[in-house]
A protein has these predicted regions:
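Gly/Thr-rich phosphate-binding beta-strand-loop-beta motif of the actin/hexokinase/Hsp70
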Residues: 1-36, 187-208
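Generic structural signal for well-ordered alpha-helical scaffold segments
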Residues: 62-66, 117, 121, 173, ...
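Short beta-strand-loop/turn "lid" adjacent to the catalytic site in phosphate-handling enzymes
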Residues: 62-110, 128-130, 136-147
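Gly/Ser/Thr-rich active-site cleft segment
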Residues: 77, 107-172
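Contiguous, glycine/small-aliphatic-enriched amphipathic segments in soluble metabolic enzymes
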Residues: 15-78
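Glycine-rich phosphate-binding loop of actin/hexokinase-like ATP-binding domains
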Residues: 140-224
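Electropositive phosphate-/nucleotide-binding environments in soluble metabolic enzymes
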Residues: 52-59, 89, 93, 107-114, ...
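Short, basic, glycine/proline-bearing loop/turn elements
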Residues: 43-45, 49, 98-106, 157-158
Length: 224
């Protein structure tokens, strides 16, 4: 079983899967401290009210699942900035430290996401946690897209465009392939429009450019 957490700038989204089937979705509105859900939610969560602290909410949901099924699921997190990580990674002390170094580049998402990860690790020491990154989808962009016109000494310090909302782009690509299996052989523009917003250019299934760059602050006007 897999429990997923997506810490957004305005919400916490949680989903629980068994054998590739989603059993429930739970969305916590951070400002309203209200939780909405669909599916077969554990009985202890039916009348649950958010505590207003993301890490406490995450631990409460994980504890409710453990009480219901007597098994700790694998936990997967959407992490906005992965730096040089191009694939999902298992979270340990080393990877957590590297992700913390990237927090200033996405201050609305990275710190609360890492706080949830740390809280779950403290509450459930045997829990396996995986991080999947918004930046990974853009890791194959051409140098023309990710290089800034800066001296090499600065570029060697990893000052470059990373691109974000990559997991959203991957999800859209998968859904489009169901409708048209030739979608990976052409040009495509993907618009991620929510509280955060970006546009991605895709060629033959590979990201070519994203309106965000070194940090999540670049590009289109957004909710914050």
């Amino acid at each position: 079983s897999v429990l997923t957490f997506n810490v957004g700038s305005s919400s916490l989204k949680i989903a629980y899967y068994q054998q590739q089937q989603c059993l429930f979705n739970l969305t916590v509105d951070i400002k309203q401290q209200r939780a909405n859900w669909t599916g077969q939610i554990p009985t202890s969560l039916v009348n649950w009210q958010s505590m207003g602290v993301l890490s406490d909410d995450a631990c409460y949901v994980a504890q409710a699942l453990y009480q219901q099924y007597q098994v700790l699921p694998l936990v997967a997190h959407r992490v906005v900035h992965g730096g040089h990580y191009h694939q999902p990674v298992m979270i340990n002390i080393e990877t957590l430290a590297k992700l913390q170094q990237l927090a200033p580049l996405c201050p609305l998402h990275q710190p609360p996401t890492l706080a949830v990860i740390e809280a779950l690790a403290a509450r459930f020491p045997q829990l396996i946690q995986i991080a999947a990154f918004d930046t990974s989808f853009h890791s194959q962009q051409p140098a023309l897209s990710y290089c800034y016109p800066l001296p090499l000494t600065l570029r060697n310090k990893d000052i470059r465009a990373y691109g974000f909302h990559g997991l959203s782009c991957q999800s859209i690509m998968r859904q489009l392939l169901v409708l048209d299996n030739t979608i990976n052989t052409g040009k495509l523009l993907i618009a991620h429009l929510g509280n955060g917003a970006s546009i991605t250019a895709v060629l033959d299934g590979i990201s070519q450019a994203n309106s965000m760059g070194f940090s999540t602050l670049d590009g289109l006007p957004m909710g914050t």
